[in-house]
């Protein structure tokens, strides 16, 4: 499920995943096109729930960054855009946010932004997204997430 957004924004949600197979995940995705996108995942990786981010750029392979292990009970995910820059944050409580990734992605046209459930090695997974929230305002303190 996605929408097109132009300009600055912040999109956040609380995600839960049943996590049975490797890489089962709840994902917040930002996409310019098939060769230019980024995703922030609450993912079952290395036999535990983790925060994972991936950025793909034209002419290169995707990178994959396992950030840290988190509780299996669910996590808050957030993408914010300001100009050509994007930041990925996670939070345990939806109040205090931790920076996962900060990167530049050129895009003059509107970008696709939305939620994805993925289970690339399994038979599917149940993902629940709660409180999907949009704001036209970006986060102003990227490092602290405020």
Language model segments and positions:
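Extracellular glycan-recognition regions
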Residues: 1-146
